[in-house]
Amino acid sequence: MEIQQTHRKINRPLVSLALVGALVSITPQQSHAAFFTTVIIPAIVGGIATGTAVGTVSGLLSWGLKQAEEANKTPDKPDKVWRIQAGKGFNEFPNKEYDLYRSLLSSKIDGGWDWGNAARHYWVKGGQQNKLEVDMKDAVGTYTLSGLRNFTGGDLDVNMQKATLRLGQFNGNSFTSYKDSADRTTRVDFNAKNISIDNFVEINNRVGSGAGRKASSTVLTLQASEGITSDKNAEISLYDGATLNLASSSVKLMGNVWMGRLQYVGAYLAPSYSTINTSKVTGEVNFNHLTVGDKNAAQAGIIANKKTNIGTLDLWQSAGLNIIAPPEGGYKDKPNNTPSQSGAKNDKNESAKNDKQESSQNNSNTQVINPPNSAQKTEVQPTQVIDGPFAGGKDTVVNINRINTNADGTIRVGGFKASLTTNAAHLHIGKGGVNLSNQASGRSLIVENLTGNITVDGPLRVNNQVGGYALAGSSANFEFKAGTDTKNGTATFNNDISLGRFVNLKVDAHTANFKGIDTGNGGFNTLDFSGVTDKVNINKLITASTNVAVKNFNINELIVKTNGISVGEYTHFSEDIGSQSRINTVRLETGTRSLFSGGVKFKGGEKLVIDEFYYSPWNYFDARNIKNVEITNKLAFGPQGSPWGTSKLMFNNLTLGQNAVMDYSQFSNLTIQGDFINNQGTINYLVRGGKVATLSVGNAAAMMFNNDIDSATGFYKPLIKINSAQDLIKNTEHVLLKAKIIGYGNVSTGTNGISNVNLEEQFKERLALYNNNNRMDTCVVRNTDDIKACGMAIGDQSMVNNPDNYKYLIGKAWKNIGISKTANGSKISVYYLGNSTPTENGGNTTNLPTNTTSNARSANNALAQNAPFAQPSATPNLVAINQHDFGTIESVFELANRSKDIDTLYANSGAQGRDLLQTLLIDSHDAGYARKMIDATSANEITKQLNTATTTLNNIASLEHKTSGLQTLSLSNAMILNSRLVNLSRRHTNHIDSFAKRLQALKDQKFASLESAAEVLYQFAPKYEKPTNVWANAIGGTSLNNGSNASLYGTSAGVDAYLNGQVEAIVGGFGSYGYSSFNNRANSLNSGANNTNFGVYSRIFANQHEFDFEAQGALGSDQSSLNFKSALLQDLNQSYHYLAYSAATRASYGYDFAFFRNALVLKPSVGVSYNHLGSTNFKSNSTNQVALKNGSSSQHLFNASANVEARYYYGDTSYFYMNAGVLQEFAHVGSNNAASLNTFKVNAARNPLNTHARVMMGGELKLAKEVFLNLGVVYLHNLISNIGHFASNLGMRYSF
């Protein structure tokens, strides 16, 4: 039987397979049956193939148990066993190469045509129920097996332990099976010294088209004492039901290994499972490229050895790979007296009987063995041991340089999820990192190590971009789980992580370590570390409207960006942060104004420690839900604040740690709703406009100080410093701090209390006023330099210029009686009358001790916790309803004792805002829910959010918004079509210079005999003056609309020609595609649309008169979503889809004025046009009562226009033009159905008659003989709504 020897590479549609994480073994032949151990099989199967969840070792599909049992069962008993023994001639020539099929196999393998599958296939002689054993254990040399395609069984066992096997030298091999009532498994076993795979190998593929019988299961075993390798072009494909066993000292597969290939076209929904077993490889296993899945939810498993290396791992969007590492000590071999071993011996003995009873021997060393006529005996199977999941040994490693997911455009609710699972001690992802291919509806990747650690050295990419963003209306989700079962795994990320918009990261582990995370590239990310049970360590975290779920963390640096996000879009630490959380440095970046502010807020926690805190204008820090926040080093304003910039810092209880410094000014806007403890820190007050800002404490304040003296100045270390105090407004009390209760304590003496006059006086000595760096409330004078400093502080030039006149002050402390201080149980303040002047006998002095540092003390670190002066918060009173009916939003405000907020609501948001709030909180929920929402939100914030929502809803109802993508595409095409008409209107240019150049080129030329000189003139005439053209352009556009972001990009192509018959005319047609996106200022409305535009255009010439005609149509498919982040508006979040369409016709007349030998043409023109715009009705996918609905809309517009165009032609083909004009709408009719939310309706306002001004320009240059480059830009401005539209194009033209 001949088999094909032609070269062939596989190129078939493939399927995905769903796996088993079960170790699958076989019993190939008696000589090495014990090599593939089976004692561990049932335990592994029981531990990892129970349950139904995909993606975890302990929860694989139940099929795993089925396939493992089938592959591990006693091989199917053959009807006949054919045996071939290689003669001694094969033992003599180690350098000789043989064709294994022709030399030994062909006599016992039949072949034929499979009509059902329309392909040829091969089988063991006599049928798939027979077996072929080839004994060539002493053979040497190299044996090739090439072109054994569609081998459908039965079992094939080749023992060539001393020889080299080359699979697929000229053609590939395919080993498969047929599904029949016996459900047989095809087992193919090659045992060689070395095995190299040079072409494709298929395991359990369907024969031919796959339309006939399907495959059952196939086990291919490759054993090599030295090594198994594959060429880079040799692809190994495992189909549904395939198992590949590899046993060697090392395995190195350079070609792609594809697990889960499609067996036939259309098998995308069919279940599919495959397994690779490398547990008997003693060295490293290397996969250069491993692919799992082919357009379906394939699951695959690798029963691994200690070290598995994968270069690139490609996962289909819903595929899963499970890599099972061996336990500590490895897999244990089965004892020799196990039932299965006995069974094997019995089989051998029974075969021996057959040899004696019904054997026939011939000179070809071939023996036919028939089974006995007696009935087959019942076999007793081994006892199955059910075990739980196990951890990989401590030295087990899985290395993957790069993980990549592949996806298509299929949309499914919840998106698709790919997974990688292992139990190795270490899962290491290299410098290649992880790439997640994102499509509409979202894509996710789960990387899980059930019992070990995960390390990622490379970046995280979305659609092959670091910082890449998810498509509109979708999300991209990375998920890493370390030590899921042991609760003791560590996840480490050694590269900076940059996440674009709507890209999320989830990490579950005992400990998680990150180099850096940046979510400030657009915001709306989730960092979910709530599954980390011990500590999350982040070197640098950059956020902007990011949801951070984390507890007990160490963040070296936290940078909070505003990034153009609207008010209310904060970075939200959405989990209780616990009691062990610390941030070394917090930096709030400067916003631009209130509409572009941001910040950070916390859901709750026991304690947060911050070393350094730098805040900036228009950024917010809300830690009111954290019980205690401590600043240990610095709380300071970052970049110098501008007069309009306000920062807001909000705390529950705040502690300023020992030696910490806090800057405070009018820009700080610090709120402390609970207690404030200054534990030997310093508060720096900045004077602005002659005033200081008052630090207000909601409950109690404690001022803890010590007796330490600064030896350089002689002063006690101050707790409060007022800088530039000389600028304070005189005769005015300046309150520095006020609280319900203020207590004072001296930690050096261990005394503290409330209303303790002695402690209050001690504190006043630590309240210092400075003029520059010189203290002005008290002067400690030790020498003449101190006299000068005192003079500069109080503004006394005499002391500065003549310090000797004031030597009587040396050795004394002088008190400036122009400054009085108050420190009592409710406030701390200063009163500035103006500076007094020291006199020799004026008093107000105190003698200094001989050694000014003798009274210094070492302050202890006692904190004033549970201060005796703390008081509980008052409980607010409830006010009965007496003005409004129950069930209205007004009644809820009144019940909350916020009646004034009703007026604020109507004043700032109007009746429409009130109705929307009624719909969201009461009509869709109840009064209790409404009370909960308004209690959590101020009146100003409610009106801001309502105004944002109504603006967004008005956008949704607007037909102008729905067709904006089509209008931008039409504007782009108008620019391109005008350029084409300018190009083909070169009617007046006489090409004098060009023609002269051509005549000059003919000088001294000699030609063969021609019928006429016309042929010469034609050859050198300008051929490209009026050509037929094919053109294509890349287009882009954007709308400048009050902060909204609307853009379009796409392509346009067409064909046109100049007709020079009885009528001179230009005719052409075009088609274009553009993808448009829209994000409003609040980023609450996101849209993406696919738009098409097509039409025809023409120009007719009559002397210098030009008549233009144009007709076009457009269609757009829009997918939009509402994405409000605030709890108040969360019910509005939903997505919807609609179609937008337009049709337009235009006619215009113009007259050409030619100048400069017809190179310059000026053309005034007038025209009229008609536009029909419309959109279909839609209903959102929301299940809430506020599901958005909108009816269809339609509008007819009639316009008139006037334009002036200048064209300049130079050379033979190049030109430049500029066109400016005005378009006026003079009539419009149509309908606009209201958008509705439950009982709330949004009626789109009818637009006024618009006036547009338009300027466009462009030109073209010749690149090659018949190829031209053109460029154009256009700007359209709506003079009524003040909205601008900009578009540009870059394209090529080919003339023929």
From Swiss-Prot:
Disulfide bonds: none
One GO cellular component term: extracellular region
Feature: compositional bias, Basic and acidic residues: 345-358
Residue span of region Disordered: 326-380
Domain of life of the organism encoding this protein: Bacteria
GO MF, one annotated term: toxin activity
Alphabetized Pfam families for the sequence: VacA
Domain Autotransporter: 1023-1296
Residues annotated as signal peptide: 1-33
Compositional bias segments (type: Polar residues): 359-380
Keywords from the named record: Cell outer membrane, Membrane, Periplasm, Secreted, Signal, Toxin, Transmembrane, Transmembrane beta strand, Virulence
Keyword Membrane annotated: yes
Purpose: Induces vacuolation of eukaryotic cells. Causes ulceration and gastric lesions.
Domain notes: The signal peptide, cleaved at the inner membrane, guides the autotransporter protein to the periplasmic space. Then, insertion of the C-terminal translocator domain in the outer membrane forms a hydrophilic pore for the translocation of the passenger domain to the bacterial cell surface, with subsequent cleavage.
Protein name: Vacuolating cytotoxin autotransporter
Organism of this sequence: Helicobacter pylori (Campylobacter pylori)
Gene giving rise to this polypeptide: vacA
